[in-house]
Curated annotation (Swiss-Prot):
Entry annotated with the keyword NAD: no
Function: Necessary for efficient RNA polymerase transcription elongation past template-encoded arresting sites. The arresting sites in DNA have the property of trapping a certain fraction of elongating RNA polymerases that pass through, resulting in locked ternary complexes. Cleavage of the nascent transcript by cleavage factors such as GreA or GreB allows the resumption of elongation from the new 3'terminus. GreA releases sequences of 2 to 3 nucleotides.
Family note: Belongs to the GreA/GreB family.
InterPro entries (alphabetical): GreA/GreB_C_sf, TF_GreA/GreB_CS, Tscrpt_elong_fac_GreA, Tscrpt_elong_fac_GreA/B, Tscrpt_elong_fac_GreA/B_C, Tscrpt_elong_fac_GreA/B_fam, Tscrpt_elong_fac_GreA/B_N, Tscrpt_elong_fac_GreA/B_N_sf
Lineage: Bacteria, Bacillati, Bacillota, Bacilli, Bacillales
Signal peptide from the UniProt entry: none
SUPFAM superfamilies (UniProt xref): FKBP-like (SSF54534), GreA transcript cleavage protein, N-terminal domain (SSF46557)
Protein name: Transcription elongation factor GreA
NCBIfam families xrefs: greA (TIGR01462), PRK00226.1-2 (NF001261), PRK00226.1-4 (NF001263)
Source organism of the structure: Listeria monocytogenes serovar 1/2a (strain ATCC BAA-679 / EGD-e)
Alphabetized UniProt keyword annotations: Coiled coil, DNA-binding, Transcription, Transcription regulation
Coiled coil stretches, renumbered: 10-37
Length: 160
């Protein structure tokens, strides 16, 4: 039997997934069923684009529900405050300066299930996070990214 993939995440990340799951099950599912019902009333389903679109959306919603249920079932909750031992760990917020230009960037390292670069949350599987994990404040680190090597100095690590 294959082992299930573990999804490391913060309590906040798990709560967001639970909220999304609740929304999908109680609101989106009903909306899609209603769209299918309306589209069926148009008659011939063989050339009914509204029906096809609603069925596609239903498949997406059901797939997302299954994915989220799996993530929640296999969640490994990370307590950043507990794990923070002076080293960059999952759940930490890290501020670093790109060398040599001095551009400052701040990211929170989270599990892939809750990553959102637009909110400054990067996956622990991303090249930047992989390069920062296990290092401490004041360290200069070379991070290998698809665009090439990037040198940074870790300025601050905080538990999120």
């Amino acid at each position: 039997m294959a082992t299930e993939k573990v999804f490391p995440m913060t309590l906040d990340g798990k709560a967001k997934l639970e909220n999304e799951l609740q929304e999908l099950k109680t609101v989106k599912r009903k909306e899609v069923v209603e769209r299918i019902k309306i589209a069926r009333s148009f008659g011939d389903l063989s050339e009914n684009s509204e029906y096809d679109s609603a069925k596609d959306e239903q498949a997406f919603v059901e797939g997302r529900i299954t994915t989220i249920e799996n993530m929640i079932r296999n969640a490994q909750i990370i307590d950043a405050a507990e794990a923070h031992n002076g080293l960059v760990t999952l759940g930490n917020t890290v501020t670093f300066i790109e060398l040599p230009d001095g551009e400052e960037e701040t990211y929170t390292i989270v599990g892939s299930a809750e990553a959102d670069p637009f909110e400054g949350k990067i996956s622990n599987d991303s090249p930047i996070a992989k390069g920062l994990l296990g290092h401490k404040e004041g360290e200069e680190v070379t991070i290998q990214t698809p665009a090439g090597d990037m040198s940074v100095k870790i300025e601050k690590i905080t538990a999120s």
